């Protein structure tokens, strides 16, 4: 029996997909994003072990809210693609119950991506950076792993919401936005694009975990500049 490691479960989520959602945070991540606000999800040995059936039982309590609001379950992390067998199991169980499924991912894991996506209604795709050097700078890994997942997304044709964090000096240039637009143009079924402002709310977690926060000297993203970049991106995508 495949066991999953779950960091936490958040009910009544309103921003991680359509409708009212329950967000299940998987434990473990292979990236070390400079601005990660959940470093407590990194360790694969953390969290609580559950079977897919045990997790489904918890999720079914919220099904009336899903049904009334057009919501469902979003599997986030950590990185959901690091537990591919468990993810497939729980996705299948949710679909059998008529629950809308979404995965919130950086596209960096392993396993049969296409099999995962066959049981996924929506992918919330976090594009960390637009080129290999930038990807390494932010995550510690190259962009190739992300590109492999993107191919699977294209092959299946699943619906996609794009997310990209705007970080001062790292991703806030017009050149970066132009490259981002070129990536998005080549993805089918993109329903929504969000430029998320970098914030510093997670710094206290690093202090508690005795971890170095690499972006300590970078201020939170200016809201007006983010809006201008969002407008620029929209113009490029029209």
Curated annotation (Swiss-Prot):
GO CC annotation: cytoplasm
CDD domains: Radical_SAM
Cofactor: [4Fe-4S] cluster
Binding sites annotated in the UniProt record for S-adenosyl-L-methionine: 35-37, 78, 126-128, 199
Binding-site positions, [4Fe-4S] cluster: 29, 33, 36
Enzymatic reactions: glycyl-[formate C-acetyltransferase] + reduced [flavodoxin] + S-adenosyl-L-methionine = glycin-2-yl radical-[formate C-acetyltransferase] + semiquinone [flavodoxin] + 5'-deoxyadenosine + L-methionine + H(+)
Radical SAM core domain location: 15-236
Keywords from the UniProt entry: 4Fe-4S, Cytoplasm, Iron, Iron-sulfur, Metal-binding, Oxidoreductase, S-adenosyl-L-methionine
Listed EC numbers: 1.97.1.4
Gene3D superfamilies (alphabetical): Aldolase class I
InterPro entries: Aldolase_TIM, Organic_radical-activating, PFL1_activating, Pyruvate_for-lyase_activase, Radical_activat_CS, rSAM
Protein location: Cytoplasm
GO MF annotation list: 4 iron, 4 sulfur cluster binding; [formate-C-acetyltransferase]-activating enzyme activity; metal ion binding
Pfam families: Fer4_12 (PF13353), Radical_SAM (PF04055)
Record text on cofactor binding: Binds 1 [4Fe-4S] cluster. The cluster is coordinated with 3 cysteines and an exchangeable S-adenosyl-L-methionine.
Metal-binding as UniProt keyword: yes
Main location: cytoplasm
Enzyme class: oxidoreductase
Function comment: Activation of pyruvate formate-lyase under anaerobic conditions by generation of an organic free radical, using S-adenosylmethionine and reduced flavodoxin as cosubstrates to produce 5'-deoxy-adenosine.
NCBIfam families linked to this entry: PFLA
Family: Belongs to the organic radical-activating enzymes family.
PANTHER family xrefs: PYRUVATE FORMATE-LYASE 1-ACTIVATING ENZYME (PTHR30352:SF5), PYRUVATE FORMATE-LYASE-ACTIVATING ENZYME (PTHR30352)
Protein's recorded name: Pyruvate formate-lyase-activating enzyme
Gene name per UniProt: act
